[in-house]
Amino acid sequence: MKDSMSILTQTPSEPNAAHPQLHHHLSTLQQQHHQHHLHYGLQPPAVAHSIHSTTTMSSGGSTTTASGIGKPNRSRFMINDILAGSAAAAFYKQQQHHQQLHHHNNNNNSGSSGGSSPAHSNNNNNINGDNCEASNVAGVGVLPSALHHPQPHPPTHPHTHPHALMHPHGKLGHFPPTAGGNGLNVAQYAAAMQQHYAAAAAAAAARNNAAAAAAAAAAAAAAGVAAPPVDGGVDGGVGLAPPAGGDLDDSSDYHEENEDCDSGNMDDHSVCSNGGKDDDGNSVKSGSTSDMSGLSKKQRKARTAFTDHQLQTLEKSFERQKYLSVQERQELAHKLDLSDCQVKTWYQNRRTKWKRQTAVGLELLAEAGNFAAFQRLYGGSPYLGAWPYAAAAGAAHGATPHTNIDIYYRQAAAAAAMQKPLPYNLYAGVPSVGVGVGVGVGPAPFSHLSASSSLSSLSSYYQSAAAAASAANPGGPHPVAPPPSVGGGSPPSGLVKPIPAHSASASPPPRPPSTPSPTLNPGSPPGRSVDSCSQSDDEDQIQV
């Protein structure tokens, strides 16, 4: 800037030239300058134009004063200049208007002896109008390339390029177009530049304040949108009003956590896995729901620690009925001092466990059935050999020593028998067979199932099958009495199935051992008798 100020005072003069040569020289320079700005239309111009030429005409001839101004070291893209364009536009607009009027009057007065006064004044009027219009556009800060040159330069017009008036960089950083002719001195230019940079700093501060205020407003709006889930919970009312027909859909039984319940319903026995509870009993959640994942992801609710009394009552209720109506669930929750949602979630989890154990038990029973079919194909005692407590009975039947596959299937059958909760009466009471101790006789389902009762019913199932097999082979030895039940007590009475007289007399002769292989159906045990009457009794025994 210091260099440019010092250059302002230097006005090297050129020798007098003829009037046509002067116009030709000016038109050539302006055309080159015009092409330069068209080529670099999207880039901010430098601080000063490479050529500023002002012409002063007199009656004695034409004298040309050309001042060549160098480019100081300055960044092309200065954000302060861009931001301060609108701030400094008002300062220069009035001053440029007076300078343009003064320049217009000087050109009209000095151009009277040049012979081209009408054309010169017309062109000057056009350019002054373009300058005013371009200064208004530049005050707004719009920089389209089409506004740089509203009309082409006439070759006889000697004023400076109008780009210095319409681009904010040219407006603020360049010397004004009439600096040489109208006498804008160094002090005025320095004051203008100082005011320009002060306005740029003020505009930058205002922009930062506006950005901070906008960010604060956006954060407040986001907090206002996300505030209701913080108070009421993300799913505050979901699942609190189940359908009147039942508890919940079977497809959504398993809920490892108390997801569908509001944490405000936790009782005194509730504990939190992530920080305990606050004073009101609500669980303290980790994280904030005002985050981006607050509305999309459910917060983990606290687990309920049930007491022994509550668990025993819930288990007894679950043995009676697997599904609760809304009224029954509310009564049970009131009785146990629990929330309705906690009882519902416990029932969902318990039903899932029940179904899983049922599937495992049925799978093991299917394995045992497949083993029975396998033994039928390749000989041996199919049922007593598979039962782990019938080693002596198998020896009495003349069974071969057990192999590895025998041991595997015996263990599978024992595991199936020891499964505690069977879903319903898988081995229903049969009137012709007296089942062991602790098991009710009759077609109705059992009131409850324990490990011993399940084992007794499974033992009676295999013993009745062995009795049917011995009835099919009258010449074979009779089965041995089974050992006592696991649950303790006397051995069950009447385990051997009586043979009806009419079926024994009317039975056909026994088939040879080469019977066709039965179908390996995992859903039900294979057929064990040729007698149609015994087959119908077996169908009555298994009510799945």
Swiss-Prot record:
InterPro entries: HD, HD_metazoa, Homeobox_CS, Homeodomain-like_sf, Mediator/Homeobox_domain. Pfam families: Homeodomain. Residues 299-358 bind DNA. Residues 53-73, 92-179, 236-308, 471-544 are annotated as: Disordered. Residues 476-485, 507-516 have a biased composition (Pro residues). Residues 247-262 have a biased composition (Acidic residues). B-H1 and B-H2 are abundant in the eye-antenna imaginal disk. Expressed in R1 and R6 cells throughout larval stage until 30 hours after puparium formation, at which time expression is seen in the anterior and posterior primary pigment cells. Coexpressed in embryonic glial cells, neurons of the CNS and PNS, most latitudinal anterior cells of the developing notum and the central circular region of the leg and antennal imaginal disk throughout larval development. It is found in: Nucleus. GO terms for cellular component: nucleus. Keywords: Developmental protein, DNA-binding, Homeobox, Nucleus, Sensory transduction, Vision. One of its GO terms (molecular function) is RNA polymerase II transcription regulatory region sequence-specific DNA binding. GO terms for biological process: chaeta morphogenesis; compound eye photoreceptor cell differentiation; eye pigment granule organization; eye-antennal disc morphogenesis; leg disc proximal/distal pattern formation; negative regulation of DNA-templated transcription; negative regulation of transcription by RNA polymerase II; regulation of transcription by RNA polymerase II. PROSITE patterns: HOMEOBOX_1, HOMEOBOX_2. The keyword Transcription regulation does not apply. B-H1 and B-H2 are regulated by members of the wg signaling pathway; wg and dpp. B-H1 and B-H2 are coexpressed and functionally required in R1 and R6 receptor cells and primary pigment cells for normal eye development. Coexpression is also required for the fate determination of external sensory organs, formation of notal microchaetae, formation of presutural macrochaetae, antennal development and for distal leg morphogenesis; segmentation and specification of tarsal segments 3-5. Belongs to the Antp homeobox family. This is Homeobox protein B-H1. It comes from Drosophila melanogaster.
